[in-house]
Amino acid sequence: MPSLLVLTFSACVLLGWALLADCTGGGGSGGAGPGRGRREREALPPQKIEVLVLLPQDDSYLFSLARVRPAIEYALRTVEGNATGRRLLPAGTRFQVAYEDSDCGNRALFSLVDRVAAARGAKPDLILGPVCEYAAAPVARLASHWDLPMLSAGALAAGFQHKDTEYSHLTRVAPSYAKMGEMMLALFRHHQWSRAVLVYSDDKLERNCFFTLEGVHEVFQEEGLHTSAYNFDETKDLDLEDIVRHIQASERVVIMCASSDTIRGIMLAAHRHGMTSGDYAFFNIELFNSSFYGDGSWKRGDKHDFEAKQAYSSLQTITLLRTVKPEFEKFSMEVKSSVEKQGLSEEDYVNMFVEGFHDAILLYVLALREVLRAGYSKKDGGKIIQQTWNRTFEGIAGQVSIDANGDRYGDFSVIAMTDTEAGTQEVIGDYFGKEGRFEMRPNVKYPWGPLKLRIDETRMVEHTNSSPCKASGGLEESAVTGIVVGALLGAGLLMAFYFFRKKYRITIERRNQQEESNVGKHRELREDSIRSHFSVA
């Protein structure tokens, strides 16, 4: 697994550091004294907050600039008082936002360095983004070095939870993949399950599903639950029969992450193999509140609809908990209008990223206000980022809670088919991340009916592990199993050889005694025979 922790800066970035250090005398440490803070607070109005947004220009991403920019501007109007008439910052405070194409790669880092170099060492006050893991890692390291607060609705992989050193200035305003893993753990505890197979798409590029199930695996591993895994590339021809065979050879509880069409294909293949009658439990993770990923929708208007409806009776979908409030409806309409003006027409105008970056502005402003009141300045990035941690505030879609490590708690729902005749689905359970509590909703029909799910976790299985589920530098489970089985077989063979040799030795000794008693008789008979022959001769 390519590790985020070993991503390195290029030589040009190191040179940029050296040049900028000469220009600015190095970055702040976040520990500026109150005296300096008071002086800057006195000169606060009028001032501007410079924000650098690093997101891809490519609209194939759910978090492209065209999709997220309307949400950021909506939030800025709110905090500047233009929308509500209530200002959250001192009069005269204005935001100056620069939008740069991250290209979901090294361009994000280069954009940051080039911008600072062009401004003769002047750094932005806030970084929003990037989202993609491989783009976010070097930017987060540089933000920590330069004492810049960095808020993102991305960088969701497990590696970013290590905030003690290189990611110390990162706050994640969307639930990380590990939070999804905590939800799955609570679900498994509820059902008293301990084993699962992870089936996911991995294109070796953005690797969203890989990082998602890596988070699930790490949480399960810490708690002693067993996982095996199977991955495939959706950009190539899929062998659905092969995927189903791997599931049959592994576990009865299946956690999947792939596009909605691929999920449908897997469920159809599983149904044809008789795997949707209660002996298997299928879970699909709908990433980012986007219907691109399997959202539980079985209907396509084709000849397979009836069969798909039957298959989906065994499928449950994990999605972010959705809340509805009047302000959110207004926000959604404005975002939709702005996005459509960009020439984009789709169902998912407001996904997890759009919500997250809106809430990132609110969170930053709340933290900045507290830092300014304490006598520090907008340049005290370490102080600001600490104020964004371990707090709860009201976001655009409901309450947002950030834990003590700067990661947002995740609230999730489980959606299942409750009417197999009509094929309708509804939420049957919810997980509340801050409390770590999973609850089934009352008065809903359980998807399998009473005691219909028959999962035998004691059976022997074959494991195909090709995933995030192996620890670097260690033996895979299959290797350990092979060693143990080989040792047992070897010991059995040695014991069998010992007893066989002992019995064989006793038999030989008995035969030798009998032969010694008869050897004289045989010799006499042979000699008599020889003599008789010679006599005949």
UniProtKB/Swiss-Prot annotation:
Instruction: Kindly state a single biological-process term from the GO annotations of this entry.
Output: skeletal system development
Q: Which InterPro entries match?
A: ANF_lig-bd_rcpt, ANP_Clearance_Receptor, ANPR/GUC, Peripla_BP_I
Sorted keywords for this record are: Cell membrane, Disulfide bond, Glycoprotein, Membrane, Receptor, Signal, Transmembrane, Transmembrane helix
Its main localization is membrane
Q: Which GO terms describe its molecular function?
A: natriuretic peptide receptor activity; peptide hormone binding
* GO cellular component terms listed in the entry, alphabetical order: plasma membrane
Q: Disulfide bonds, which pairs?
A: 104-132, 209-257
Glyco sites are at: 82, 289, 390
Cytoplasm listed as a keyword: no
Extracellular side residue ranges read 42-477
Q: How does it sit in the membrane?
A: Single-pass type I membrane protein
Record's Pfam families? ANF_receptor (PF01094)
List all topological domains (Cytoplasmic). Answer: 501-537
Propeptide, residue positions: 21-41
Question: Residue span of the signal peptide, if any?
Answer: 1-20
Which family does the UniProt entry place this protein in? Answer: Belongs to the ANF receptor family.
Q: Additional info?
A: Has low affinity for peptide hormones in the absence of bound chloride.
**Quaternary state and partners of this protein?**
Homodimer; disulfide-linked. Interacts with OSTN.
The free-text function statement in the UniProt record for this protein reads:
Receptor for the natriuretic peptide hormones, binding with similar affinities atrial natriuretic peptide NPPA/ANP, brain natriuretic peptide NPPB/BNP, and C-type natriuretic peptide NPPC/CNP. May function as a clearance receptor for NPPA, NPPB and NPPC, regulating their local concentrations and effects. Acts as a regulator of osteoblast differentiation and bone growth by binding to its ligand osteocrin, thereby preventing binding between NPR3/NPR-C and natriuretic peptides, leading to increase cGMP production.
What name does this protein carry?
Atrial natriuretic peptide receptor 3
Q: Which species does the entry assign this protein to?
A: Bos taurus (Bovine)
Which gene carries the instructions for this protein?
A: NPR3
